[in-house]
Each structure stands twice: as structure tokens, then as C-alpha cells.
Amino acid sequence: MSWLNIENSPNNFHLTMTAEEIIFKYYPKDNALRRLLLHHSHQVADMALAVADRHPELHLDRDFLYRASMLHDVGIFLTDAPAIHCFGKAPYLIHGRLGAELMREEGDEKTARVCERHTGTGLTAENIRTQNLPLPPGDYLPETLEEQVVCYADKFFSKSHPERTRTPEQVAKSLAKFGEAGVEKFWEWQRRFG
């Protein structure tokens, strides 16, 4: 089932469009959902940029870190998650994939990759198969340093509790229910980016 009808989506993106302009395009009303998305995205961006500041040896692309952090959750409006003001039809789990489709329609493959690879610490084809997840088969793992940093930073913030910043221990505990591999990946990132 297609949750996003790309054929009917406007395609007026030129690579000069800012992250905020894209958000306002898909979230035109100043409502609780847009405010929550902006708040969460700024939290993730602030942490991702702090990683770049702490680790100049990584030569991270700060402009892209900001853009990707702001847009990693752009697909949430298409999902059914009323507790965070999302009244779409798709399962929340696929918000990254939906955001990736939006970004591809906008002509932004680089940001699309971040959208579809930030769930947990990434999803493998094995995860999708064994857990019967509603995603196309494939590996959705953050590969570039920027993809990894955005995924890492996102784990510290929840849209359900936007006022809180999780500790690394809380992040690890939240990932444990999905398996030890994700916890190990997070601790690897914590050692590298923390």
C-alpha cells in the first residue's frame, strides 16, 4: 500500500530551498504538530552541531548536519500517531521512509538517506524480515558520518516528551527492546561522538 502519492505531490524544490521552507511547505499551518516538529528538529540539530564542534577532526559538514537534522522527521504528518499530533494513515514506524520519499520528490537524495536511516540505530533487511516490518526489503543503516551523527543525536530526544533530554544510559535502555546490536552501535557512537 502506498501511503504517499508522489504523482500528486508538488515538485518545486530547487537546491536553494531551506530546511525551514520545506517544513513550512508540508506543515503550512502553525499548529501543535509543526511546533513539535520544529522543537524536536532544533534539539537534534543543536546536538549534531555540538558533535561537530567537539570533533573537528571528523570534518563534518555543518550545513548538511543542520539541514538533515531539521528534515529527518519531515514524514511524520503522514503517520497515525495522535499522541504527537499526527493524524495520517501510515504506521509511525515508516515515517523515515515516507520522509525519504518526500525528499526524493524534492530532489534531495542526500537528506532522503538520513530520513530513511535514522530509525533506531538503523534497520537491517533481517530486522525487517524477522519483525515483519512494513518496509521494503533492504538495509537502512546510517553510513556516512553525518547520517550517523544525526541518528545518534536523535536518540536523545523524544517527541512524546519534548522537555526531556535522555542520558546515554536512558538511550541504551530504550534501544535494548529492539536487540543488543542497536545498543552496541549506540555505545560505539557515544564513544566516538560523545
Mark where each language-model region is:
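Alpha-helix initiation and N-capping motif
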Residues: 16-20, 108, 168, 183
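Alpha-helical scaffold segments in carbohydrate-active enzymes
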Residues: 47-50, 155, 192
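Generic alpha-helical structural signal
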Residues: 42-46, 97, 187
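Divalent metal-dependent catalytic cores for phosphoryl transfer on phosphate-bearing substrates
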Residues: 57-168
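Acidic/His-rich, divalent-metal-binding segments that scaffold phosphate/diphosphate chemistry
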Residues: 3-92
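A general alpha-helix detector
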Residues: 22-26, 47, 98-99, 152, ...
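Charged phosphate-binding loop/patch that engages nucleotide di/tri-phosphates or the phosphate backbone
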Residues: 175-194
